Amino acid sequence: GKEISYNNLLDIDSVIRLVREFPGKIAAAIVKHQNPTGVALGSSAEQAYRTARAVDELAAFGNVTAISSTVDEACANAIKETFVEVVVALDFTDEARSILKKKKNLRLLKTDLVLPVDLGIRLEGRTLAHGMLVQQIDNSLWDDFKVVSKRKPTEEEIQALEFAWRVVKHVRSNSTILAHPDRTVGTGPGQTARVDSFRIAIEKAGENAKGAAAATDGFCFADSIELAHNAGITAVIEPGGSMQDNETIEKADELGMALVMTGMRHFKH
């Protein structure tokens, strides 16, 4: 394929970080402009990829994909159905290579970085007009998993909440992810108003918002809880620590929703 661009490399980094969140599982993540259009688990590479792509078929056009296993013939046939810029995977079978090499602009990257290997890298940085910022890489998940609502989340809701929280940490704040236990269904990335990230995620999810869990990296106020409930979302996970926490908890209890606070905001910028 053609040369890998600067933007491709940024998306490659983002998509690798996403699939590394799910050790021991077959995960697929699809990224555009460093934000996930879909993330999913599956019993095979093909199933994980198809599920991730189906989250938002329109946004997935021209994406960068990562799969935390070997891409086989079935998965390659699925990938070739649409325009993909780059596929990053643990490996590619000979049959998969033969299929995908016919896509002249597609780049294939084989790497074990899709697995949660410890690279020994602890810092990351960004350049500024007047210097550089350096910080520790955010390898944590949460400080706590505290159920603050009267209703406790079900086991299925807990799985969906964790899935959503693992993804939302990689989305620019203010962000919201809607998810079921094995896949995202809606992404609301990088909004200046936290409630707008909820609205966008709900709009993207459509009917799939019903029964989903929501993870938000911004403070979740009562208006977001009500918006989520009206869309059929049953459980929410958020950082907590706002002066309006009590109002948020009261609204969740009023609506019979499960609410979890993590004590940590990933606050990706």
Can you say where each PLM-predicted feature lies in the sequence?
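ATP-dependent carboxylate/acyl-activation modules
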Residues: 1-269
